[in-house]
Amino acid sequence: MRYTMILSVLILFAGCAATRSPTAGPAREALMNGYSTARVDFGIVVSDIDKAAQFYKNALGLVEVEGFDVPADMGRNSGLSDNQPFHVRVFKVADDENATQVKIMQFKGAPGKRVDNTFIHSSFGIRYLTFYVQDIAAAAERVRRAGGTVIANGPVELPKELAPGVFLAVVRDPDGNMVELVGPKKQ
């Protein structure tokens, strides 16, 4: 009898474990809201794709993964471009299927117009990307060594009540887009 009871409990737990969703917390919530993943990717149109690629690889330390081509008719039919074909170069923080992708592309035959990137309030739209780093001082130094600029007085410490011991540095990519680096200073 005791053996049967223990076996029944084990079978019940095994059944519960088998039906449990593999995702939990915010990721599970995102999937419950109709999304297929909790990941968000970004596309950035640049004026010089090679220069931008060097910045995202060398200054930010992203990993370039396989890119892809978008044919003219796909660009037109999807509303992404006015019948312009384009190549997309893809970068990630890590070569991991769940890592956010930063996708850069250039339109040599139809160059875009620059927006005012002086401050985040200077134009509407997506104003900056945020990367969370392990050491803000090392990340800022990597940007400087790669020829980039940390703007204003960064890195600056966030208010202690918001995030004690966490710093913020804002840098610009070659087209002036803001990239925010957030993390602690290692001693």
Where are these predicted regions, by residue range?
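Residue-level detector of conserved, well-ordered beta-strand and adjacent loop positions
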Residues: 92, 105, 172, 182-183
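Vicinal oxygen chelate
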Residues: 46-50, 65-66, 97-100, 106-178
